[in-house]
From Swiss-Prot:
Signal peptide: none annotated. It comes from Cryptococcus neoformans var. neoformans serotype D (strain JEC21 / ATCC MYA-565). Keywords: Activator, Chromatin regulator, Cytoplasm, Cytoskeleton, Nucleus, Transcription, Transcription regulation. This is Actin-like protein ARP6. It is found in: Cytoplasm; Cytoplasm, Cytoskeleton; Nucleus.
């Protein structure tokens, strides 16, 4: 019997990244939402929103709420669009599926996944896992030795939340996964309130404000200094940007606006010389302009200080340090040396540099800090899944078939994919051995092997602490490594 094609769906709360394994090396990306325009009185499903000419007052209906898929009626409509000839043109009955699910997915929601996929869409087989479980297969942590690290920290920065996920030997250590209630949605809403209070009323302009946040936002490396800089005159200020809002007129093709002046301003060829981006030039007095000063970095700062808006949670650096402190002492050096960033929010400018700097104050002097950033963190789960599904053993090992489901029900999926809170996924990237508890003591022979490979730092060495930064191309999909070296010698 011929092996069916494998459809990969990274089913995020904000966007879907999907494609056929071995065919679509880059995913098709479409919004995971149904949008309704108040002016055009039309409904747009998924990528159809690209045809909307007036994004003012767009109302969204999303399948996800607080990070969980709770509206399968809406999700089914979006997936139907995804499978249609206009997008992927696939027949589910002739296809195997790999789909990502939320961290700590509730059992009743997980069962609904099984029912919809096998009973509604009738896929031949499918496998379900959290995004971080796929990352060991990708090239994010790839080294010159070609040996994947056995202990890593994955920071998944998504639409609803940010998760800090420890992974050992290809398995998520579920009892130590931590969540910060700061994601892309919160940052967009925070920016909406700042702009509406200080400048224009944009409470109903979610789509436009989200574009403003993505274009202008950055993580401050000097919070107090940047605040003082923003007080200078706008025309001579190195931080303040002029962001021209879209007018949604018939002659305008700029749907989300553009940066007219300041850092990252649109170049003249993109603005037709001095006017609107690819649109009809307007007199400056007719344009609605946002002055983006401290609004650029006030939102991303919440990742490091959630308490600024009343969240009783520690920031991202402290959460990472706490998670690593719960690991066996013999392995903490490897966790510190392999911290990876994935998810759409990982694209924020200066994130890796700020995280590295803040972690230096929390990391013991004998360990190294390694921050790994993908060039496209939003698509890393998808590209990692392509590597997994390309393996010879994938089809015979991971998916549950439709026949097996109707014979044993969702109980088989629970056993094979893992249940709520369990160390669930038997994913064994090359070089890993699964089934080892992260709390197991490490033998002397294994530690000596790790020292020899440079995967672990010895404690008690003498030497002055020094800092060294380097960036190298890592992996098939362009990971970037920034490393800070601890002790100068043993």
């Amino acid at each position: 019997m011929a092996t069916p094609p494998v459809l990969i769906i990274d089913n995020g709360a904000y966007e879907i990244k999907a494609g056929i394994s071995g065919v679509d090396w880059e995913p098709r990306v479409l919004p995971n939402s149904i949008a309704r325009s108040r002016t055009e009185k039309r409904v747009y499903v998924g990528d159809e929103i690209d045809n909307c000419k007036d994004l003012s007052g767009i109302v969204y209906r999303r399948p996800f709420e607080k990070g969980m898929l709770v509206n399968w009626d809406a999700e089914r409509i979006i997936w139907d669009r995804l499978f249609s000839p206009s997008v992927l043109n696939i027949n589910p009955t002739e296809t195997s599926l790999l789909v990502t699910e939320p961290y700590f997915n509730l059992p009743n929601i997980a069962e609904t996944y099984d029912q919809m996929i096998f009973e509604e869409f009738e896929f031949q087989s499918y496998f379900r896992c959290a995004p971080a479980a796929l990352i060991p297969y990708g090239g994010l942590y790839e080294s010159d030795q070609g040996i994947p690290p056995q202990c890593t920290i994955v920071i998944d920065m998504g639409y609803s939340y940010t998760h800090v996920v420890p992974i050992r030997d290809g398995q998520i250590v579920w009892e130590h996964v931590k969540r910060i209630d700061v994601g892309g949605k919160l940052l967009t809403n925070h920016l909406k309130h700042l702009i509406s209070f200080r400048q224009w009323n944009m409470i109903d302009q979610t789509h436009v404000v989200n574009s403003v946040r993505e274009a202008c936002g950055y993580v401050s490396l000097n919070w107090k200094g940047d605040l003082e800089t923003c007080k200078a005159k706008p025309r001579k200020n190195p931080i303040i940007q002029e962001y021209v809002l879209p007018d949604f007129s018939a002659n305008s093709t700029s749907r989300t606006g553009y940066i007219r002046s300041g850092p990252n301003a649109a170049p003249p060829e993109e603005t037709n010389g001095t006017g609107e981006v690819n649109g009809k030039q307007k007199p400056e007095e007719e344009e609605q302009v946002l002055w983006m000063g401290n609004e650029r970095f006030a939102g991303p700062e919440l990742l490091f200080h959630p308490s600024d808006i009343g969240l009783k949670q520690t920031g991202l650096p402290e959460t990472i340090a706490y998670v690593i402190s719960q690991m066996p002492e013999e392995l903490r050096g490897m966790f510190w040396a392999h911290i990876g960033i994935i998810g759409g929010l990982g694209n924020i400018e200066n994130l890796g540099e700020r995280l590295e700097r803040d972690l230096q104050a929390l990391c013991p002097v004998e360990y190294e800090i390694g921050i790994y950033e993908a060039f496209d963190p939003a698509s890393l789960a998808y590209t990692s899944a392509t590597a997994l599904t390309s393996s010879e053993v994938y089809m015979s090992t991971y998916p549950v078939t439709r026949t097996e489901y109707f014979e044993q029900g969702s109980s088989l999926c629970r056993r094979k994919f893992g249940s709520f809170g369990a160390p669930a996924y038997n994913i064994d990237p090359p070089g890993f051995s699964s089934g080892v508890d992260a709390r197991t003591e490490v033998s002397d022979d294994e530690m000596e092997m790790r020292y020899a490979m440079g995967l672990e730092s010895k404690k008690g060495g003498k030497g002055k602490r020094r800092k060294e930064e380097e960036e190298v191309t890592s992996g098939n999909w362009g990971g970037r490594r920034r490393r800070t070296t601890g002790l100068g010698g043993f």
